[in-house]
Amino acid sequence: MKLGAYYKGGDLKKPSGGKKRKVRKTKKKALGGGPPQIPKLGENDTRIVERVRGGNLKVRLREAKFANVYIPKERKSVKAKIISIISTPANPDFARRNFIVKGSVIQTEVGKALVTSRPGQDGVINAVLIE
C-alpha cells in the first residue's frame, strides 16, 4: 500500500504530495464588515452610510447624544438628551464603556428609558420611557 492513499492532511496537500492552491481570489462579499463598531455615548450624533449586499445602503450610528423617547402615558415621542447608560443586559461591560445597544437602559432628560431600536443597524436610538 502507498502512503499517499492514507494521507490525512487534505486541506494543504494533494495525494501526490503537491501543494493545493486557492480555488479563487477572495471576494468582497466574503470579507464581512470588519470588527464590530458599537455606538457610544458622545458629544454629538455621528452616522456613517455604508454600501451593503445588493447595493443597498445601511446607516450606522457611531456616536449618540440624543434619543427619540416614546412616553406611553402621553402617547407622544420627544427628542431627549442622553445623560448616561444605566445598564445593558446583553453585556455588563457595555454600560461601563458607554456602548448603546438594543435592550440598554438609558438615563435621559425625561427619565429612564429602554432602547428598542438597534442603533448600529438603524442609525437612530428609539426608546420607551419606563419611569
From Swiss-Prot:
GO BP terms: namely: maturation of SSU-rRNA from tricistronic rRNA transcript (SSU-rRNA, 5.8S rRNA, LSU-rRNA); translation
Query: So which domain of life are we looking at?
Result: Archaea
Compositional bias per record (Basic residues), positions renumbered to this chain: 16-30
Signal sequence region:
none
A single GO cellular-component term from the record reads: cytosolic small ribosomal subunit
Q: Which PROSITE patterns match?
A: RIBOSOMAL_S8E
Q: Which GO terms describe its molecular function?
A: structural constituent of ribosome
**Region: Disordered, residue numbers:** 1-42
Q: Which UniProt keywords apply?
A: Ribonucleoprotein, Ribosomal protein
Oligomer status and interactors: Part of the 30S ribosomal subunit.
Q: Which family does it belong to?
A: Belongs to the eukaryotic ribosomal protein eS8 family.
Q: What is this protein called?
A: Small ribosomal subunit protein eS8
Per the UniProt record, the source organism is: Pyrobaculum aerophilum (strain ATCC 51768 / DSM 7523 / JCM 9630 / CIP 104966 / NBRC 100827 / IM2)
The UniProt gene name for this protein comes to rps8e
